[in-house]
């Protein structure tokens, strides 16, 4: 075996180990509460959510990728059904201080979704996201089932765990 092939194999093993380690950490992670407000100014807490699954969707009103994720999730039959059957709560979170911009864009989201604003940026201490959109799926006990994932992965998860 040539040295370059061995280096490639070693690198693949290393990257696989890093990926497995990341997945194992995510499997034991908990989603954590932070300061949130609804559009009417009321405080909101993750502890108030009683559905078996919660999708934390960090988004930004000016983000084109966020618009695509919103479309994908809102058009997905399995997401709509899970929300309608009270199996899933979709919680959109705008991390920012432009409340007027946020409120002007709330009509982009399905009425069954819960929309909150983190105008104190408190979620930045508890969640890693480099840029919106960022999705976290958690279970009833607030265990992170999927961390920093895609809409496609959320939909696939819901399809495989239906019923």
Please describe what each predicted stretch is.
Residues 46-67, 91:
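Short active-site neighborhood of thiol/selenol oxidoreductases, capturing the structured segment around
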Residues 1-31:
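Bacterial Sec-dependent N-terminal signal peptides
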Residues 52-53, 68-92:
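Conserved helix-turn-beta segment immediately C-terminal to the redox Cys motif
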Residues 37, 114-119, 148-149:
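Short acidic-hydrophobic, aromatic-tinged amphipathic segments that line or gate anion-handling sites
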